[in-house]
């Protein structure tokens, strides 16, 4: 269906988001702020979140995925130190073969880059167990990151539930100047919207500036838009989209999707592309945006190019052209990780890879690698300049490292000079990169499912355990504040990636590293409280649960007996994950009450089950301090029922008898 001119009710025009969501609506009413359920056409998983997602899918007892397309990618845990990663990959490959899922082998590339190249379809819905799934918005797809359990449910044919979003139009005008690229655009978006206060919103790009951006550039913008906390971001599907799909041999997947001229939005933000200059996110948040020139001159130890944000053919060709005939500064360790095998093969064929290697850049495999902190950790107190999307403290694998997020152009300039450098100051002409009319297409590392699933044996190594089970929510909570944390606590703070990520399939072991970065004694304290018969309660500040979609930031707290998290505000994916695992997400009615609670305080919530069912305000008593305060929730009726049952798996079993 061509969605270029589909009118809404009473002749009102519709935007892209509304058109696609209405077409996929299966539950609820399309009304901003209300819960809706949408049909999911495609799913993707990556190996760090995928093992648990497929274990949960198996527990549902369904014999075949019920989506149009589901793909299992291996791109996170590709450094085999010990048996765990290899065992997980064998499990994932066998599950994919048995249940009708495509399997993208290690080395084929980063899930978002490969999916954009080979599977993304305008006008469809994509749910991925990775927070940067909105990359698909660059091709005109409603692409949303979620926890693995939500993805498992979607694979089983259930709707995906979300709050019907406020839609913010980002009206792009003008065109980018030389040495300014899509990464600078999304850093400008982060400067405008910040990393908090955007839950329940979607960014819809439009305006005359859109046609000046290629699909990979658009995908860079929608990818890192995840850092604002929006549900997703999306671009129109136009002739530029058609050219990209034709070059991928997929022109038949194209359809035009544009907003109606009279579409209405909750807000319109104008961005003049011609006024953007090279930008950088300084430590320790993607929202700490400054101009490169304002912080230029910092000595740099490391430059890393790649990640799902900036590892496309266009990005790496820019790097190659800037580096051609030059050398990486002797004080800089430089590494490049292509986003896909297709990109690497293109660079090898046209000679660009030789230019990169000749300059002194190390070439890593086509994977996430340094971005998630499981390789290329910087030196102690080192400065690392990266083209990735997150610079949270400790995420690089080095707790005291300073990580700066930049465009490929700025990264290449910095490699050469050894200092953080505005690329305009290199004094050379801006390289021109022409997108190929035809990409190299070789899908031999994407394995189809078995023709006869009954003959497939699921491989389960010792690292693969059963999904942990939770009890129904008790009538009352008698607990202890196990930890009190501040604002902008990320899922990296809650449960680290990096070297610990190989334990993702082993929840009891992985739980030992809860809050390791913040408080190494948390696990010991939590287990002591649990074993005493009390429950654990976490208290946090603003935007609790930023960052990665990893549901282990909810599964592991559930395992150690956390029953409630009380904060000033939550980020969307983490709040949904808490619900999925039977943990109650509560917020302070009066934020000042945060200051009246301390770690170790004994907390009680009487008649919690009844309170959840009957209203959104709940009374909490701090027995240690002898005071009471109110908290609230914004859960739907369905979410309340999930929590009462002890989580989504238990709820589904009750619902389906």
Tell what function each PLM region has.
Residues 3-4, 8-657:
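Fe-S-dependent hydro-lyases/dehydratases of central metabolism
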């Amino acid at each position: 269906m061509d969605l270029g001119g589909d009118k809404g009710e009473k002749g009102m025009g519709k935007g892209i988001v509304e058109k696609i969501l209405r077409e996929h609506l299966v539950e609820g009413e399309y009304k901003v702020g209300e819960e809706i359920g949408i049909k999911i056409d495609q799913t993707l998983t990556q190996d760090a979140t995928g093992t648990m997602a497929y274990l949960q899918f198996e527990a549902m007892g369904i014999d075949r995925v019920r989506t149009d397309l589901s793909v299992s990618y291996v791109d996170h845990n590709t450094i085999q130190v010990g048996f765990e990663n290899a065992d997980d990959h064998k499990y994932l490959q066998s599950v994919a073969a048995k249940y009708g899922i495509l399997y993208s082998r290690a080395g084929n590339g980063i899930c978002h880059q490969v999916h954009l190249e080979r599977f993304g379809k305008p006008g469809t819905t994509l749910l991925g167990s990775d927070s940067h799934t909105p990359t698909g918005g660059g091709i005109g797809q409603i692409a949303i990151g979620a926890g693995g359990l939500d993805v498992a449910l979607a694979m089983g044919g259930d709707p995906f539930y979300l709050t019907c979003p406020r839609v913010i139009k980002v009206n792009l005008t003008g065109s980018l100047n030389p040495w300014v690229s899509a990464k600078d655009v999304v850093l400008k978006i982060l400067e405008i919207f910040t990393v908090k206060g955007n839950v329940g919103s979607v960014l819809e790009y439009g305006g005359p500036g859109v046609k000046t951006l290629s699909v990979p550039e658009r995908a860079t913008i929608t990818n890192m838009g995840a850092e604002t906390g929006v549900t997703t971001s999306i671009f129109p599907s136009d002739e530029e989209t058609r050219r990209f799909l034709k070059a991928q041999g997929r022109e038949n997947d194209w359809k035009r999707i544009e907003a109606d001229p009279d579409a209405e939005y909750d807000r319109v933000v104008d961005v003049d592309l011609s006024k953007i200059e090279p930008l950088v996110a300084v430590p320790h948040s993607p929202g700490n945006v400054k101009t490169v020139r304002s912080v230029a001159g910092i000595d740099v130890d490391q430059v890393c190019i790649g990640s799902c944000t900036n590892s496309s053919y266009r990005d790496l060709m820019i790097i190659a052209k800037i580096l051609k005939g030059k050398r990486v500064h002797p004080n800089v360790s430089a590494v490049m990780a292509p986003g896909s095998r297709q990109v690497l093969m293109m660079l090898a064929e046209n000679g660009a890879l030789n230019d990169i290697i000749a300059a002194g850049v190390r070439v890593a495999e086509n994977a996430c690698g340094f971005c998630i902190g499981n390789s290329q950790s910087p030196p102690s107190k080192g400065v690392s300049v990266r083209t990735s999307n997150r610079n949270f403290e400790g995420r690089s694998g080095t707790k005291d490292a300073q990580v700066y997020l930049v465009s490929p152009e700025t990264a290449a300039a910095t490699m050469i000079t050894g200092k953080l450098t505005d690329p305009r100051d290199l004094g050379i002409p801006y390289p021109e990169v022409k997108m190929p009319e035809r990409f190299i297409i070789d899908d031999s590392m994407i394995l189809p499912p078995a023709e006869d699933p009954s003959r497939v044996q699921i491989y389960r190594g010792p690292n693969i355990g059963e999904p942990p089970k939770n009890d129904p929510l008790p009538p009352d909570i008698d607990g202890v504040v196990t930890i009190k944390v501040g604002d902008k606590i990320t899922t990296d703070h809650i449960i680290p990636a990096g070297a610990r990520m190989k334990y993702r399939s082993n929840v009891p072991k992985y739980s030992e590293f809860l809050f390791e970065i913040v408080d190494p004694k948390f696990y010991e304290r939590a287990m002591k409280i649990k074993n005493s018969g009390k429950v654990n309660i976490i208290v946090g500040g603003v935007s609790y649960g930023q960052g990665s979609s990893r549901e282990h930031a909810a599964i592991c707290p559930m395992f150690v007996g956390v029953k409630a998290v009380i904060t000033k505000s939550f980020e969307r994916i983490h709040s949904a994950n808490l619900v999925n695992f039977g943990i109650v997400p509560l917020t302070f009615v009066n934020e000042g009450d945060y200051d009246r609670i301390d770690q170790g305080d004994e907390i009680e919530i009487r008649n919690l089950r009844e309170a959840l069912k009957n209203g959104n305000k709940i009374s909490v008593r701090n027995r240690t301090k002898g005071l009471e305060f109110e908290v609230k929730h914004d859960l739907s009726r369905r979410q309340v029922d999930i929590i009462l049952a002890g989580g989504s798996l238990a709820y589904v079993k009750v619902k389906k008898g």
